[in-house]
Curated annotation (Swiss-Prot):
CDD domains: Peptidase_M17 (cd00433). The keyword Transmembrane helix does not apply. The lineage of its organism: Eukaryota, Fungi, Fungi incertae sedis, Microsporidia, Unikaryonidae. It comes from Encephalitozoon cuniculi (strain GB-M1) (Microsporidian parasite). This is Cytosol aminopeptidase. SUPFAM superfamilies: Macro domain-like, Zn-dependent exopeptidases.
Length: 486
């Protein structure tokens, strides 16, 4: 099957002489009125806004066609004295609003008139530019070219992170019949094949059987699609010691299995591989950025479907580390494939292990789409993750990883059961289940991105479909870890 051309989603800094030049001017709101946030202010611009009675509210936008044919977009950022996370989010919304004002142009060279919140504004431009138009009969905007004209490190970083985030969104938005385990591997191969210092291999069902990855195999056995295990290595510095292993949940479609989900919104479960999409995107981005770190990537890929061969509620499978698990809910499958993948990742003896998954609906209830929930027993790692979330404008919230939850995961016929009765503490019990497959000597963190896989409160930025949230905080975390390790 021919792969879709995701490359057309990418934005760069290659300028085109025929491009429309678009300048973005941020406008703040305060008691004194609208304020222009520009390094060089024009009296004419202030008069323009005054005539329009502009307030600088978030999302407020005005377009001015200058005499030289250039376009200036004035966009509101609101009150800049608010909480820093709110201001950053408003700046991202401003970038998205600015893009939408000029999105009719096929060729644009965009620039900012101020460095204030430049990373966040450009992030908004990047995310708002994403449009999944690969399968329509009429393909709109086939030749649109956008360039961000800036020498700023913050802006350049926002562009490459935005491209990686949009790649993760593409993977998550592609229908499951076009993104099964085999096709995911083909996209991953295309994405990784030319990256410097990267090697990768793909293992099949027979390998998993030899490694006794029976939890992973148990999830996949209801589908005609064979499971895959994608393993990649990036060596950004000398030596072969592994600094960090990234593990991503790759359930390419999750029907719930025999514990079938309700049909309403089941179509969203094509995105149940966004953990895999996120770590793949971040891994490739780290290689592109040349981060001085040695990193492994482990992605288990399956479909979770009901059939005559599917795992049944009450079945018991023995994981790669020898622990037996009673499958009392086949819709709690992500933790099963992660368990074996985490055990496999430990064979390389990494210093840090980070797994990412759209794991629990309970996380949606707990944090909504405002924060990513994460779990770790390592306070130093937690501080790095928390600050990375702030710096990357991809906020996170630490959740309890406590042995107090473990008794609820005990089974009378196996070492563990895979889901708690009644769903109480669903995210925390899932995390403590995973901890049973990670050695205490490893610095481990678990990201549950289920709540942010799509967005209700930021549709002006993300639109419908996948958000790619998790990519910005992960690459920021990896950069910070590289400075500590080196």
């Amino acid at each position: 099957m021919e792969l879709l051309s995701y490359e057309k989603l990418m934005i760069g800094d290659e300028l085109n002489k025929d491009s429309v030049k678009v300048r973005i001017v941020l406008c703040s709101n305060s008691k004194e009125g609208v304020g222009i946030m520009a390094d060089e202010k024009s009296p004419g611009h202030q008069n323009f806004l005054s005539r329009l009675d502009a307030k600088g509210h978030v999302g407020e936008a005005y377009v001015l066609l200058e005499g030289n044919g250039e376009v200036t977009v004035f966009v509101g950022i609101g009150n800049v004295e608010e909480d820093i996370l709110l201001v950053k989010n408003n700046a991202r919304k401003a970038g998205a609003s600015a893009y939408k004002c000029v999105s009719q142009f096929k060729n644009m060279e965009m620039s900012l008139t101020s460095e204030y919140m430049a990373r966040e504004v450009v992030s908004g431009i990047m995310l708002a530019s994403y449009k999944y138009r690969f399968l329509h009969k009429e393909k709109d905007e086939p030749s649109k070219k956008i360039a961000i004209n800036s020498q700023s490190h913050a802006v350049k970083k926002a562009v490459v992170v935005g491209n990686a985030q949009n790649f993760a969104r593409f993977l998550g938005d592609t229908p499951a019949n076009l993104m099964n385990p085999t096709l995911f591997v083909e996209y991953a191969t295309k994405y990784l094949q030319d990256k410097k210092n990267v090697t990768f291999e793909v293992f099949d069902k027979s390998f998993m059987e030899r490694k006794s990855m029976n939890l992973l195999l148990g999830v996949s056995q209801g589908s005609a699609q064979e499971p895959k295990l994608l393993v990649a290595r990036y060596r950004g510095k000398s030596g072969d010691a592994v600094d960090i292993a990234l593990v991503g949940k790759g359930v390419c479609f999750d029907s719930g299995g025999i514990s079938l989900k309700p049909s309403a919104r089941m179509h969203r479960m094509k995105g149940d591989m966004l953990g895999a999409a996120s770590v793949l995107s971040v891994f490739g981005l780290a290689a592109d950025m040349g981060i001085k770190i040695n990193m492994n990537l482990v992605i288990p890929l399956v479909e979770n479907l009901p059939s005559g061969t599917a795992t049944k509620p009450g079945d018991v499978h023995v994981g790669m580390n020898g622990k037996s698990v009673e499958i009392n809910n086949t819709d709690a499958e992500g933790r099963l494939i992660l368990a074996d993948a985490l055990v496999y990742a430990q064979e390389a003896n990494p210093t840090y292990i980070v797994d990412v998954a759209t794991l629990t609906g309970a996380m949606m209830i707990a944090l909504g789409d405002a924060f990513i929930g994460y779990f770790t027993a390592d306070d130093d790692l937690s501080k790095i993750i928390h600050q990375s979330g702030i710096d990357a404008n991809d906020p996170v919230w630490r959740m309890p990883l406590s042995q107090l939850y473990l008794p609820s995961m005990k089974s009378n016929v196996a070492d563990l059961k895979n889901a708690v009765e009644g769903g109480h503490g669903g995210s925390a019990t899932a995390a403590i289940f995973l901890s049973e497959f990670v050695g205490k000597e490893f610095k481990w963190a678990h990201f549950d991105i289920a709540g942010v896989m799509d967005s209700n409160n930021n549709k002006g930025v993300y639109g419908d479909g996948a958000t790619g949230c998790g990519v910005p905080v992960l690459i920021e975390m990896i950069e910070k870890l590289s400075t500590i390790i080196n």
